[in-house]
Amino acid sequence: MKLQPLADRILVKRLAEETKTKGGIIIPDTAKEKPAEGEIVAVGPGRNAEDGTKIALEVKVGDRVLFGKYSGTEVKIEGEEYLIMREDDVLGIVQ
């Protein structure tokens, strides 16, 4: 897959969602919520500061991140679903 995000945008692949609760109840597809956790697949070069310098992103490829439920734009590339979002949409990095 070849997609290079621009500026401070990142490409995220959602992590697989749980199909069972801790109590063993199977969750049907119609009741599942999209996970708000994913892995960064590609990052842009960073955003431009007012003085013209480039501000590097704090996240990097391979980071596991948390993001808002409605963050980003869903795109389909080579049959796989991804999200393109700004770095500001990332709430935190899972260590």
Swiss-Prot record:
GO terms for molecular function: ATP binding; metal ion binding; protein folding chaperone; protein-folding chaperone binding; unfolded protein binding. NCBIfam families: PRK00364.1-2 (NF001527), PRK00364.1-5 (NF001529), PRK00364.2-2 (NF001531), PRK00364.2-4 (NF001533), PRK00364.2-5 (NF001534). Its main location: cytoplasm. Keywords: Chaperone, Cytoplasm. This is Co-chaperonin GroES. One of its GO terms (cellular component) is cytoplasm. It is found in: Cytoplasm. SUPFAM superfamilies: GroES-like. Together with the chaperonin GroEL, plays an essential role in assisting protein folding. The GroEL-GroES system forms a nano-cage that allows encapsulation of the non-native substrate proteins and provides a physical environment optimized to promote and accelerate protein folding. GroES binds to the apical surface of the GroEL ring, thereby capping the opening of the GroEL channel. GO terms for biological process: chaperone cofactor-dependent protein refolding. Belongs to the GroES chaperonin family. The keyword Transcription regulation does not apply. Gene3D superfamilies: GroES chaperonin. Heptamer of 7 subunits arranged in a ring. Interacts with the chaperonin GroEL.
